[in-house]
Design a protein with these regions (language model features):
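Short, conserved phosphate/pyrophosphate- and ester-handling motifs at nucleotide-, phospho-/glycolipid
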Residues: 30, 171, 240
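Positively charged, low-complexity intrinsically disordered leader regions
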Residues: 1-14
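Ribokinase/PfkB-type carbohydrate-kinase core domain
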Residues: 1-3, 55-57, 61-65, 83-223, ...
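Substrate-binding N-lobe of the ribokinase-like
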Residues: 11-83, 90-94, 289-294
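A short, flexible beta-alpha/helix-coil linker loop
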Residues: 9-12, 149, 174-176, 231-232
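Conserved phosphate-binding/catalytic region of the ribokinase-like
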Residues: 186-296
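Glycine-rich phosphate/pyrophosphate-binding beta-alpha loops
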Residues: 21, 73, 94, 117-119, ...
Length: 296
């Protein structure tokens, strides 16, 4: 069983609102790739909260959603000269996830737990999630998908979560930021990933570089690098989360590093061809990698 901990929210787009949140996206794609799972979050006792609970159910996402007196999470998206600017509203329901016996019981059963920096930006949810992660069973995957957003992070938080994690995922822009933050100089991207692997005793470090490539290094010395296949992009919402969810589900079901990596790349490419982070899956996800390789 796979769990995610953190934000559940509405993106308030100029065209209307869209349900999302990286941890919930992660569960959606884990479940579509062979895992059972739950998203754990909180929404307000308000109309937006009612609608968000309904949206997760309609998408087939199993979730343990606390209700509290804080407003349901939103992200205000404004277009400035055609470029979206995001304001992740503070002081919302998912900033106040309560530490409960029900959540402890779920975490104790989990084979993998996913979390990121945003879901721990507030003291209450930070303390809840950190305490819950202490209850994972031996050998459970603790997947830290850094997902840096705005100024909702600190070096102290990233270091704390790296010490908790067994898997660390970041993108090329986040690696640039972390090189400066951790004073990692004069090394290749692969060497920088291995620095995190060794410094924090991780099982895997995953680096994604958008439309270019992705690479995974492991504590066994095995690694996998895959060029990103070219697809007609509708939007990239949830693509990184779909990569994480697919990789986790495949590894838990016994896939090799290379098999899990290729599956994750294909799913992320598929998600980019669709609108939104919770697309309807086809019977079989296209093998974009095999197609690209056959055309070389």
């Amino acid at each position: 069983m796979v769990l995610s901990l953190g934000e559940l929210l509405w993106d308030m787009l100029p065209s209307g609102k869209r349900a999302g949140g990286a941890p919930v996206n992660f569960i959606y794609h884990s479940v579509h790739n062979g895992a059972d799972g739950y998203a754990i979050s909180a929404v307000g006792e308000d109309e937006l909260g009612d609608e968000l609970v309904a949206a997760t159910k309609n998408a087939g996402i199993n979730a343990i959603i606390q209700r509290n007196a804080w407003p349901t999470g939103t992200v205000d998206v404004q277009l400035k000269n055609g470029i979206p600017e995001y304001t992740i509203v503070r002081g919302v329901a998912w900033d106040h996830i309560l530490y409960t016996r029900q959540l402890i019981n779920e975490v104790e059963k989990a084979d993998a737990v996913c979390f990121g920096t945003l879901g721990l930006r507030s003291p209450e949810s930070h303390d809840t999630i950190i305490e819950l992660l202490k209850h994972t069973k031996p050998g459970a995957m603790k997947f830290f998908d850094i997902n840096i957003r705005g100024d909702h992070y600190s070096k102290e938080l990233i270091d704390e979560l790296l010490r908790t994690a067994t898997v660390f995922k970041l993108n090329d822009a986040e690696l640039l930021l972390l090189r400066d933050m951790f004073n990692i100089r004069g090394t290749s991207d692969d060497e920088a990933c291995r620095w995190f692997l060794n410094e924090y005793g991780l099982d895997y470090v995953i680096l994604t570089a958008g439309s270019t490539f992705s690479t995974i290094v492991s504590k066994t010395g095995e690694s996998s690098t895959v060029d990103t296949p070219h697809v007609e992009v509708e939007d990239t919402v949830g693509a990184g989360d779909s990569f994480s969810g697919t990789f986790t589900a495949k590894i838990l079901n016994g896939a090799s590093l290379t098999e899990a990596h290729r599956a994750a790349v294909n799913v992320a490419a598929f998600v980019c061809t669709q609108s939104g982070g919770w697309p309807t899956y086809p019977d079989v996800v296209p093998d974009y990698l095999a197609e690209a390789e056959s055309n070389k």
